[in-house]
Amino acid sequence: MSLLTEVETYVLSIVPSGPLKAQIAQRLEDVFAGKNTDLEALMEWLKTRPILSPLTKGILGFVFTLTVPSERGLQRRRFVQNALNGNGDPNNMDRAVKLYRKLKREITFHGAKEIALSYSAGALASCMGLIYNRMGAVTTESAFGLICATCEQIADSQHKSHRQMVTTTNPLIRHENRMVLASTTAKAMEQMAGSSEQAAEAMEVASQARQMVQAMRAIGTHPSSSTGLKNDLLENLQAYQKRMGVQMQRFK
């Protein structure tokens, strides 16, 4: 796996699934391929994206700044600086300075990542802030190692939270989660169906599913009524794809 592929993997792991994630993935691919060279426009686009947390925006802004060639005097962006200040905690800043001194002596991606993994997410963010604000300089590889270590810590905590929700025994939470997943799947079906004649059936199934979820929420239904709803939708989507000559078996 190449360095940039690894960076893209870690960064995308902390972005919530949805259409915005696909847009960010495309921009990362373009940036890493040297196709998108307007850093100012890229940062303005990132700043106005909804849903993303300030820290995720800060990390993405840092990645873009490291990768896209820019004028030496280009202003640093406030939304990135605010996100990478370690919540203003002086303890985070103290640890960030210690980490920075170690990273300065490290020139490899994996070496920097290993060092960074022993620090808290707040200290890692503060260290990125130091480098972003030009208060310190490390090799690009070391900076990428720092970014990936931060993403790994964030993704770990997100995974724990997700696992807690998936394994919860509370029937109301499980019921709502199944309906949310079914509704999201229906939206994806509508987007994938496009405008071909064969798409009408898939669109109809997706529309009916969304209406059903709305009705279930409006009238209140038994928690077991949503069981299998998402899988039924996915089976319909796969049947539609098969007719279109597309074979994708890994949705479930």
Swiss-Prot record:
Residues 165-252 are annotated as: RNP-binding. A motif (Nuclear localization signal) lies at residues 101-105. Residues 1-164 are annotated as: Membrane-binding. GO terms for cellular component: host cell nucleus; membrane; virion membrane. Keywords: Host nucleus, Membrane, RNA-binding, Viral matrix protein, Virion. It is a peripheral membrane protein. It comes from the Viruses. Gene3D superfamilies: 1.10.10.180, 1.20.91.10. InterPro entries: Flu_matrix_M1, Flu_matrix_M1_C, Flu_matrix_M1_N, Flu_matrix_M1_N_sub1, Flu_matrix_M1_N_sub2, INFV_M1. It is found in: Virion membrane; Host nucleus. One of its GO terms (molecular function) is structural constituent of virion. One of its GO terms (biological process) is viral budding from plasma membrane. Homodimer and homomultimer. Interacts with NEP. Binds ribonucleocapsid by both interacting with genomic RNA and NP protein. May interact with HA and NA. Cannot bind NP without genomic RNA. Belongs to the influenza viruses Matrix protein M1 family. Plays critical roles in virus replication, from virus entry and uncoating to assembly and budding of the virus particle. M1 binding to ribonucleocapsids (RNPs) in nucleus seems to inhibit viral transcription. Interaction of viral NEP with M1-RNP is thought to promote nuclear export of the complex, which is targeted to the virion assembly site at the apical plasma membrane in polarized epithelial cells. Interactions with NA and HA may bring M1, a non-raft-associated protein, into lipid rafts. Forms a continuous shell on the inner side of the lipid bilayer in virion, where it binds the RNP. Determines the virion's shape: spherical or filamentous. Clinical isolates of influenza are characterized by the presence of significant proportion of filamentous virions, whereas after multiple passage on eggs or cell culture, virions have only spherical morphology. Filamentous virions are thought to be important to infect neighboring cells, and spherical virions more suited to spread through aerosol between hosts organisms. Most abundant protein in virion. When expressed alone can form virus-like particles in transfected cells. HAMAP family: INFV_M1. This is Matrix protein 1. It comes from Influenza A virus (strain A/China:Nanchang/11/1996 H1N1).
